[in-house]
Amino acid sequence: TLSIVAATINATVKGENANSYVTLTEANSYFETVPDSTTWDNKTVDQKNRALIAATRWIDSFVYYGDRCDDGQALKFPRNNYQVDGVELSCDLIPQNIKYAQFELARALANDTDAITGTTGKEGNISEAKLGDLEVKFNTASQGTGSVNNIMDVYPWLQSYLGAYMLGGAGSYQVRVVRG
């Protein structure tokens, strides 16, 4: 039989094995302060941990200003050599907006597991295709696997949390060029 290992959070700041910016306790405390916490509270500990880890991976898929504080740190934050609102980023903590982004993205991912990858099988992009008189009918309520290029397309509100830190804003598929 296949045994599934429970997801474990490692939120060590600058940790070489870190997989999350926040602990489950921090996430649960955050959701005690929002108008509707039921969409988080109704998840198991394992579902919450998996969502937090997945959210971290997506947050780390972007390119950010500044530099990682330690070469060996697993995650993109903390960072230094950059300011937000005139305040230098600190190597001792994760910026609050990064944490907020992770909380909200984790909740979104936990409640819509197909949001990024799309659906599969009969629910793909095309519902019908003909060759004679060439006719294509598209599914409008479905998005095929791999059709999302940018998590910001699905969750544009992430820009309000991450935008000040991101190189290139919401379309952060840019490459930093260093001329020397």
Positions of predicted regions on the chain:
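Divalent metal-cofactor coordination and adjacent catalytic microenvironments
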Residues: 2-180
